[in-house]
Each structure stands twice: as structure tokens, then as C-alpha cells.
Design a protein with these regions (language model features):
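Thiamine diphosphate
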Residues: 1-42, 97
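Flexible, low-complexity linker and terminal segments
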Residues: 116-196
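Structural motif
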Residues: 3-5, 30-34, 74, 82-85, ...
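Short acidic, glycine/serine/threonine-rich loops at helix termini
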Residues: 16-20, 26, 43-48, 121-126, ...
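Glycine-rich anion/phosphate-binding loop at the beta-strand->alpha-helix junction
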Residues: 36-54
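Short acidic/glycine-rich loop or secondary-structure boundary segments that cap or lie
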Residues: 42-44, 93-95, 111, 118-122, ...
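Short, hinge-like loop/turn segments at secondary-structure boundaries
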Residues: 24, 49-53, 102, 127-130
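Conserved thiamine diphosphate
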Residues: 49-101
Length: 196
């Protein structure tokens, strides 16, 4: 058995390669997808990414981003990932626990990891020193338990941290494919409802 870990950014994981993310989730392929979400194309000169908040400066939105931003975890859940979690570089111990739990899950494990980009997002949006960028992330996050207790109005602009979705019943793609292969070899009738 191989344990595949794919690391992407918010740009390549949700825009340029977003189709791969969506169909990996849909099929529930047994891999671990760590999306490093710093809210901007940080390594390619600061373009707007799918998670860039409204109003933020980028080189492709020099008067402020007008695009609505994605919630990567909602996308992964809706697309069919069987394990979805969000963590932050501010809480490395909790992030490690999420990785341990997700890596042992049999199916598509998606991790949205909020990370700072103090130069291309922070400085260029006048957030101040690097620590201010971390404080900005901290101010936009809370535990899932606390998030669930907030009113709809209080939830606006806040992201829950922790395991957000887990489906232990959904069959992993290669196991479903193997069942079809075995049934075809023995001329058995395939019950496709069991493979969902």
C-alpha cells in the first residue's frame, strides 16, 4: 500500500488544477491532499487566487479583488471527499493531529491549511509585519465547536478549524473498482448501489 500525499496551493489546487481536486474528491480516491491556503498566488507574483478575500490588493486586482472567494472545505465536501479538515500554521500541534487522523482515513482526505504570506499578501495589503498576517488568520478562525455555536451573522468571515466532514461508509475508489473487476471476472451481477 502506498500513502500518497499531494501538496498544492490555493491557486493550483482550486483554479489551475481545480478539476483534479473536484474529481479526486468525487471518486473518493485514497490520497491525502494538503492545500496550503495563503489566499494569493504567492510564488508567481501575487495574482488573485480563488480564496483571495474581497477588497484585497493583488497584481490582477490592483484596486481590490471583487471576486467572491471559495471556501475550499465546502467545495471538497460537496464534491464528495470523505474526510475534510481545516487547520492553521498558527496551531501546529492541532494541525499534526488532523494529519494523523486524515492520513489513516480510507478515502480522499482533504486538508485546507491556512498559512501566512506576509510579503505578497501581508505587506502589499498594508497588514504590517509578519506577525500581523498571522494575527489576521487567527482573527478569521475558530474551533468547529465554537463556530457551530455562532449565529449566522457571527459566522460571516469566520472559518471553522478541525474535522469538518467524515464519512467512514463511503467506499474508496480503488476498492470499488476492484469489486467491479472481480465481479466481471466471475460473471457476477454487480450491485452498483453498494459501491456508492
Amino acid at each position: 500500500d502506498k500513502h500518497v500525499i499531494v501538496v498544492t496551493g490555493d491557486g493550483d489546487g482550486l483554479a489551475i488544477g481545480g478539476n483534479h481536486t473536484i474529481h479526486g474528491c468525487r471518486r473518493n480516491i485514497g490520497l491525502n491532499h494538503i492545500l496550503i491556503n495563503n489566499f494569493i498566488y504567492a510564488l508567481t507574483n501575487s495574482q488573485t487566487s480563488p480564496t483571495t478575500p474581497k477588497g484585497m490588493w493583488t497584481v490582477t486586482a490592483q484596486y481590490g479583488n471583487i471576486d467572491p472567494s471559495f471556501d475550499a472545505c465546502k467545495l471538497a465536501t460537496a464534491a464528495g471527499a470523505s474526510f475534510v479538515a481545516r487547520g492553521s500554521v498558527i496551531e501546529p500541534e492541532k494541525l499534526t493531529k488532523l494529519f494523523v487522523e486524515g492520513f489513516s482515513h480510507d478515502g480522499y482526505s482533504f486538508f485546507d491549511v491556512f498559512s501566512n504570506c506576509h510579503i505578497n499578501l501581508g505587506r502589499k495589503n498594508k497588514m504590517g509585519e509578519a506577525v500581523k498576517n498571522l494575527e489576521w488568520i487567527k482573527g478569521r478562525t475558530t474551533s468547529k465547536v465554537k463556530f457551530d455555536m455562532l449565529s449566522d451573522e457571527e459566522k460571516k468571515g469566520i472559518f471553522p478549524l478541525g474535522v469538518l466532514h467524515k464519512d467512514e461508509e463511503k467506499i474508496e475508489y480503488t476498492k470499488a473498482y476492484d469489486k467491479v473487476r472481480r465481479a466481471a471476472m466471475s460473471n457476477e451481477v454487480i450491485n452498483f448501489e453498494e459501491l456508492v
